[in-house]
Amino acid sequence: MALKTIDALDLAGKRVFIRVDFNVPLDEQRRVTDDARIRAALPTIKHAIQARAKVILGSHLGRPKGKPDDREKFSLEPAAQRLSELLKQDVILADDCIGDGVKKLVRDLKEGQVLLLENLRFHPQEEKNDEGFARELATLCDVWVNDAFGTAHRAHASTAGMAAFVKEKAAGFLIQKEVEYLGKALGSPERPFVALIGGAKVSDKIKVLENLIAKADAICIGGAMAYTFLKAQGVAVGKSLVEEDKLELARQILERAQARKVDLLLPVDHVCGAEPKDTAERVVVNDRAIPDGLMGLDIGPKTLDRYRQRIVDAKTVFWNGPMGLFEQKPWAEGTFGVAQAMAQSPAVTVVGGGDSAAAVEEAGLVSKMKHVSTGGGASLEFIEGRVLPGIQVLEG
């Protein structure tokens, strides 16, 4: 995939619009509780500042629905404040993203200054990829840079539509890194290539599994989706979560893996409880079958050892989806055990966004991984082999 990146452009004196992903979690006092996405955009922003660009940043935050208190609830003000601290320079926050007031702020921008536009989703035209809105945003800049991998799977005005109305466009360093690592893991991985796939539903991961069966040497399954596979094999799963309407599909996936000589590993023991609560008694079931009255809530110690061994032997490891209900302590060992094993591995370790990225962050192991994706849905669609609109418009 040939992407032109921001460092290939002369930015001096130019108005450079960078689409970032500052969709960050906030507490009740509207303080940023996790600034990972802001920090992920810093290399691109700092490059533009040092290249003497007039830097204009655009992002969304949450899902405003046009209610009167939305302006306060979904304002990017907390992100502007955190960015200012990280850059150690003032960040100007506009009170809108289009209009005469914004145009004046852009006109007054000096080289190396940073202007953050207010939440793009305050305008419903953003998500509709409205041509007029995209054109109006494009009038603010000479160069358009997309560095928002988290929204690259959305064809919105600022993530894709603007590209048609600017002469110069490029990918930021974050998108470059995402495409490079996810693309390498799926395109030309060093072997053995092991994938760990977890999460609640087989239905969420069908395309991912189909794509990985064509590429991986082994796939380790965890999370609640494992019980649908086990039941499809005729194994008793107690009251574990099962997608009854996906049993035939699970059988087909198992057959396909076997036909392609891909080792598809399922749990051989389980950590169970009577209900999915952290107050439930933690029962280790030392068998593939789960007794009636119990539900599987995490992979068991023997399974974790098997999966660890696969990680140790691998040259490339890709992980997407938790191994259990890791948000609750009694059921978190499998997920954090996998994270630990990947952190200690010399292999190319790629974590595909969402809950797995959150687990790696919580365990303080981000720096030990080769790449932790910033995009939940976007990384999933990339792994499914789908075209991402926000990247497609940058190709060539």
Swiss-Prot record:
Top EC category: transferase
An individual GO BP term: glycolytic process
Gene Ontology CC, one term: cytosol
Positions of ATP binding: K205, G296, E327, G353, G354, D355, S356
Keyword Nucleotide-binding: yes
Gene3D superfamilies with a match to the protein in the record: Phosphoglycerate kinase, N-terminal domain (3.40.50.1260)
Pathway entry: Carbohydrate degradation; glycolysis; pyruvate from D-glyceraldehyde 3-phosphate: step 2/5
Keywords: ATP-binding, Cytoplasm, Glycolysis, Kinase, Nucleotide-binding, Transferase
InterPro entries: Phosphoglycerate_kinase, Phosphoglycerate_kinase_CS, Phosphoglycerate_kinase_N, Phosphoglycerate_kinase_sf
Molecular function, one GO term: phosphoglycerate kinase activity
Coiled-coil blocks: none
Entry EC number(s): 2.7.2.3
Reaction(s) this enzyme catalyzes, per UniProt: (2R)-3-phosphoglycerate + ATP = (2R)-3-phospho-glyceroyl phosphate + ADP
Domain of life: Bacteria
Assembly and interaction partners: Monomer.
Family as reported in the entry's similarity comment: Belongs to the phosphoglycerate kinase family.
PANTHER family named in the record: PHOSPHOGLYCERATE KINASE, PHOSPHOGLYCERATE KINASE 1, CHLOROPLASTIC-RELATED
Record-given protein name: Phosphoglycerate kinase
Protein source organism: Anaeromyxobacter sp. (strain Fw109-5)
